[in-house]
Amino acid sequence: MDKIKLGFVPTRRSIFSAPDAIKYRGLTADRLREIGVDIVDIDDINDEGLLFDDSHIEPIVKKFRAEGVDGIMLCHANFGTEYVCARLARELGLPVLLWGPRDERPEPDGTRLRDSQCGLFATGKVLRRFQVPFTYMTNCRLTDLEFERGVWDFLAVCNVVKTFKHTRILQMATRPFDFWSTMCNEGELLEKFNIQLSPIPMTELVQAVRDAQADEQAMAAMLAHIRDSFEICIPEDKVPAVAGLAIAMKRLVDKYGCNAGAIQCWNALQDELGIMPCAANAILNEIGIPVVCETDIHGAITALMVEAADLGRHRGMFADWTVRHPDNENGELLQHCGPWPCSCAAVKPKLTYPLAFDHPGALTAEAKHGDLTLARFDGDNGEYSLLLGNARGIDGPAGMGTYLWVEVDNLKRLEAKIVEGPYIHHCVAIHANVVPVLYEACKYIGIQPDLYDPIEEDVKAYLRGE
């Protein structure tokens, strides 16, 4: 599972009980550690370990940056000091979780010790004034279910933001000429989102494969992995090319400091190596390096976002929307030539031939059924959005490649969304419900969430703890 560091910032206000604020600072920190959260506290910033003065901001910023914090939690241990919270949050520029523990029953004389909820109202307004996006977790008790769920969902949001803002994609050759749908604006991706491409020519990839094939130790290990993972249904003399390509892509990803890849797939690669890249893609996808087909840069970005939203617990499946189910009016075939990881398959994949080409190197396997999230990051004319929603695996006719028949609530509505854009026939599926996390992450990365079902109020209700 991916690791995220949370900067824990309890805050107080002078007119309410400092001892109670200190008490709830400790209780909250203990609860966060109990549920497995890696926190960086501010206990060494002042005697109370609380934020309430401007002088605390600089040392907190310095500490959190040195520790590599990925997001912060503004914990209103009592009312809190809203303007100092906002100044800190703006200076850090990280995702912000705003929360306070539910207040106790007033004292017999009517005295209230903390007024944490009231402080949340104030801080929410001031964060808006400072133009700081934030995530609100409902005012609840430390032992409430929504506390643990809300914290972990926020950590997943932080992971999406962190991944998205530190993405570099290995672009292996140009897009296929016939695939105008996968064109992207490299300069705009960098200017808007800090998403970088590392383009290399096909000749460099082919040479890297040749170099890999000369490495006997690496080849022996990869060939053993292939034989263990796949049922071999191609000529034996083609298997080393698959192994060499997988090794080469991993080395090039490392060389250029990338976290994903996009490959041209056809036709130049077949002229040089005599194989399709699908199985090699699947091998890298399995180890958490998404490699997508047809040089679909936006598809690679989608894959990174979807897996980050699940904290790396499951692998994504880069797919085509292909044909409607012959018997189910809301059924659709998700399929591609074979890049899906083995962990997604319901059976041992066959290393074989693809649907539309004569060269070996594809995989065939139906994916596991179950509940899914489907997503697609895309854009045109300077505007970007994230199509997302839910689906479930269903039975259907046998297929070629890696495939899964899915059912959505209203296929006609989804179909229109894809056609009218800015999306294309590619998406990424994952065996997890990460719709709320992706929806929330959009506010931090400057793209518009685009739900293909009318579930926005349900998503918001989930996020606020209902």
Q: What label would you give each PLM region?
A:
Residues M1-I35:
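N-terminal basic/disordered segments at the start of proteins
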Residues V37-A66, Q207-E216:
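N-terminal beta-loop-helix "entrance" segment that forms/cooperates
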Residues D2-L6, I39-V40, G100, E104-A221, ...:
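Cap/lid and interdomain-hinge subdomains that line or gate substrate/regulatory clefts
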Residues P133, N285-G401:
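C-terminal catalytic subdomain
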